C-alpha cells in the first residue's frame, strides 16, 4: 500500500515522503496515529501543492535573511568601556548589548541568535556570528576600546 508520511517515522522516511508499506501496518498503525495518509490522487496533488507553497515561503525567508545579512555586515558595533592597564574590561560586552547596538543601526535581531560563547572581557576587535533564518550566518564586527 502506498502512503504519504505526515510525520517523520524512523525506518520509513521524512514528512512528505511517498512510501510503500504493508496494508496492515498502514491501516492499523500509521493512518490511525495520523503518521500517514493513503496515497490517492487527491492527497498526492494536495501534497505537491503544499510543497510548492513551502518552497515559495522558504524562498521569501531566504531573500529576507540575505537582506538582513547585508545590513548586519555593514555595521560595526563600537563600545568604549573602562579598562585596566592590562587591557581587561571592568565589566563585559554581552549579546544583549550587541543587540542594542544593532537595533540603534536599524537592524532587529533576537539576542539569542547572536553566537557569543562568553561575554567579551578584553579590548580589541572581534567578529561575532549571528544566526539568521534559512541557515544563513552573518558576522558583525565588534570593536571594544578603552574609555579615556
Curated annotation (Swiss-Prot):
GO cellular component, as recorded: ribonucleoprotein complex; ribosome
One example GO MF annotation: structural constituent of ribosome
PROSITE patterns recorded: RIBOSOMAL_L9 (PS00651)
InterPro entries cross-referenced by the UniProt entry: Ribosomal_bL9, Ribosomal_bL9/RNase_H1_N, Ribosomal_bL9_bac/chp, Ribosomal_bL9_C, Ribosomal_bL9_C_sf, Ribosomal_bL9_N, Ribosomal_bL9_N_sf
Family to which this protein belongs: Belongs to the bacterial ribosomal protein bL9 family.
Keywords from the UniProt entry: Ribonucleoprotein, Ribosomal protein, RNA-binding, rRNA-binding
Protein name, per record: Large ribosomal subunit protein bL9
Free-text function comment from the UniProt entry: Binds to the 23S rRNA.
GO BP term, example: translation
Amino acid at each position: 500500500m502506498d502512503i504519504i508520511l505526515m510525520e517523520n517515522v524512523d525506518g520509513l522516511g521524512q514528512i512528505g515522503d511517498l512510501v510503500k508499506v504493508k496494508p496492515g501496518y498502514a491501516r492499523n498503525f500509521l493512518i490511525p496515529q495520523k503518521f500517514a495518509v493513503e496515497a490517492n490522487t487527491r492527497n498526492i496533488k494536495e501534497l505537491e501543492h503544499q510543497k510548492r507553497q513551502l518552497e515559495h515561503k522558504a524562498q521569501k525567508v531566504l531573500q529576507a535573511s540575505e537582506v538582513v545579512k547585508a545590513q548586519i555586515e555593514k555595521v560595526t558595533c563600537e563600545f568604549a568601556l573602562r579598562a585596566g592597564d592590562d587591557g581587561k574590561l571592568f565589566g563585559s560586552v554581552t549579546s544583549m548589548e550587541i543587540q542594542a547596538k544593532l537595533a540603534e543601526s536599524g537592524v532587529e535581531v533576537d539576542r539569542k541568535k547572536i553566537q557569543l560563547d562568553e561575554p567579551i572581557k578584553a579590548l580589541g576587535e572581534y567578529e561575532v556570528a549571528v544566526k539568521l533564518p534559512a541557515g544563513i550566518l552573518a558576522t558583525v564586527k565588534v570593536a571594544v576600546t578603552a574609555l579615556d
